[in-house]
Amino acid sequence: MANGSVDMVVEAALQKQEKDRRLLRIWLRVVLFTLFCLVLVGGATRLTESGLSITEWKPIHGAIPPLSVAEWEEEFQLYKRIPQYQEINKGMSLDEFKTIFWWEWAHRLLARTIGLVFALPLAFFWLTGRVEKRLRLPLVGLLALGGFQGFVGWWMVSSGLVNRTDVSQYRLATHLTIACLIFAGCMWILRGLSHHSPDAADERTGRGFAALLTVLCLFQIYLGALVAGLNAGLSYNTWPLMDGSLVPGDLFLQQPWWINLFENPKTVQFVHRLGAYTLFAATLWHMVSMARALPGTPHARRAVLFFVLISVQAGLGITTLLMHVDIHVALAHQGMALILLGFSVAHWRGFIGEYPAPVAVEVRD
């Protein structure tokens, strides 16, 4: 094939790929927005202690809420059987029950919705040849992880139906972490489908540290889930001191000592604070190092924005403590955590660049 013909074929392939990638980017943005809403509603469900209001798992039939007085009463009677009602909410009225029911129902409905929002367009793009080969396994993997997340959600809820008045903090943290992994995976692919600046894309030090920041963000979210699961945000409501000191003296009361890291609310809050300080210092160092190594580049500018976002998140975290976990501030704190995770993934991916475009050899083959 003559070079001119090859160039025309390559140009046509590039135009088709860009059109396909534009559709995929729109779809992934919708997925990310829906995931963000799902996580926020899940946070509200936890903060309002509504997660145990629906005591059965009905993946299909459960999408329809109670429609009659008799159906509402049936749901209420099921709730009355569990320890949370018997030990905490005994005497709750039907109207009060409806309030917590709607939070959990909305969370489950959004979870079903995200499954459809992800699976149906993916099937369409796949069947119409719009999904590049390199993306097929990652996208199917994210879909499978989303399906698994549904089982994890019920596994979490079931932990609070017998012998407990709330869900296991371990299972709550697992549930949130998986949601964040799905969110991060979608962001990684979206960023890879987007145009990048070629400036210093192979700068290895910045790339490695950006990856570390992503891991730290995810770990901090995991710690935050433990805080939420144990109501540890109410352990110390002062800052920067805790019980009048930087390091309180009752952090390791339980035996063995390491169990305090997961089950002692005071220790869990302390570790979450340490994680926040570490992440703040790491992003500050990253901002300064990028300004020195790659001044004026998109990578350096993103590092500055990263530090600004971390500073806002730190302020929200402190405010959440001082306001004794006000639901609105706490939800803002959780939402900002997800925004930070997404930004950290996009920043990391920015050092790598977009997915390669087809070349003449590929087209000829």
Swiss-Prot record:
Its EC number is 1.17.99.9. It comes from Agrobacterium fabrum (strain C58 / ATCC 33970). Keywords: Cell membrane, Heme biosynthesis, Iron, Membrane, Metal-binding, Oxidoreductase, Transmembrane, Transmembrane helix. It is a multi-pass membrane protein. It comes from the Bacteria. The chain crosses the membrane at residues 23-43, 109-129, 137-157, 172-192, 208-228, 274-294, 303-323, 327-347. Its cofactor is heme b. This is Heme A synthase. It holds the Pfam family COX15-CtaA. One of its GO terms (biological process) is heme A biosynthetic process. It is found in: Cell membrane. It is an enzyme of class 1 (oxidoreductase). One of its GO terms (molecular function) is metal ion binding. The keyword Transmembrane applies. Signal peptide: none annotated. Pathway: Porphyrin-containing compound metabolism; heme A biosynthesis; heme A from heme O: step 1/1. InterPro entries: COX15/CtaA_fam, HemeA_Synthase_type2. The keyword Metal-binding applies. One of its GO terms (cellular component) is plasma membrane.
